[in-house]
């Protein structure tokens, strides 16, 4: 009986140990599975976070590059406008300077009036401030033509230059510094744009 009790105790111990080992193995296996799931979720989260970060970085780079391109375009357009304005102002200043020479203006007026039909009645309108000196030069150079139908008058609306009006048909030709500069600018502007064109 002693053996039976001993065997029974040994069997209980053995069964208890086996059960404890089985429970222990189940706990370890469950812990390993949970750990693997946690690692897998963490790796997936890390991959998603990395992909999101890379997309955000690429989007930021793309936006920054586009903003840089736009800023460069705006800068170029601004420089072109400033150069165009500088060119236009310089052209106008040069025309005003040339038109400030009364001898040049007198020669120009004479050449223009000589080229038109002799029967036409012309009115030459001059800037008020230059009128007296220009009138003297024109009277000397035109002589008889003044009596034959060319009339010289002062005109307030001209800063530099002159206007010629054909009396019998009512046409007026504007040779003021502003108009000549505008015509020259319109003529030269396409060429100027080609010179300064960057993009």
From Swiss-Prot:
UniProt xrefs under InterPro entries: ATPase_V1_Esu
Any one Gene Ontology cellular component term annotated for this protein: proton-transporting two-sector ATPase complex, catalytic domain
Keywords, ordered alphabetically: ATP synthesis, Hydrogen ion transport, Ion transport, Transport
GO biological process: proton motive force-driven plasma membrane ATP synthesis
Keyword Signal tagged: no
Entry GO MF terms: ATP binding; proton-transporting ATP synthase activity, rotational mechanism; proton-transporting ATPase activity, rotational mechanism
UniProt key word Ion transport: yes
UniProt similarity note: Belongs to the V-ATPase E subunit family.
Function text: Produces ATP from ADP in the presence of a proton gradient across the membrane.
Name of the molecule in the record: V-type ATP synthase subunit E
Native source species: Borreliella afzelii (strain PKo) (Borrelia afzelii)
Gene: atpE
């Amino acid at each position: 009986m002693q053996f039976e009790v001993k065997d029974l105790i040994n069997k209980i111990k053995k069964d208890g140990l086996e059960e404890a080992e089985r429970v222990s193995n189940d706990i370890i296996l469950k812990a390993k599975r949970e750990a693997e799931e946690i690692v897998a979720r963490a790796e997936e989260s890390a991959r998603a976070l990395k992909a999101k970060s890379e997309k955000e970085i690429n989007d930021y780079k793309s936006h920054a590059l586009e903003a840089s391109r736009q800023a460069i375009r705006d800068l170029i357009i601004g420089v072109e406008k400033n150069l165009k304005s500088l060119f236009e102002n310089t052209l106008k200043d040069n025309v005003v300077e040339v038109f400030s020479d009364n001898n040049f203006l007198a020669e120009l007026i004479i050449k223009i009036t000589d080229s038109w039909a002799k029967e036409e009645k012309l009115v030459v309108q001059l800037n008020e401030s230059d009128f007296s000196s220009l009138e003297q030069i024109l009277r000397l150079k035109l002589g008889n033509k003044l009596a034959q139908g060319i009339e010289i008058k002062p005109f307030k609306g001209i800063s530099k230059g002159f206007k010629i009006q054909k009396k019998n048909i009512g046409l007026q030709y504007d040779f003021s510094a502003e108009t000549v500069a505008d015509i020259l600018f319109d003529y030269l502007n396409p060429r100027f744009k080609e010179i300064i064109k960057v993009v």
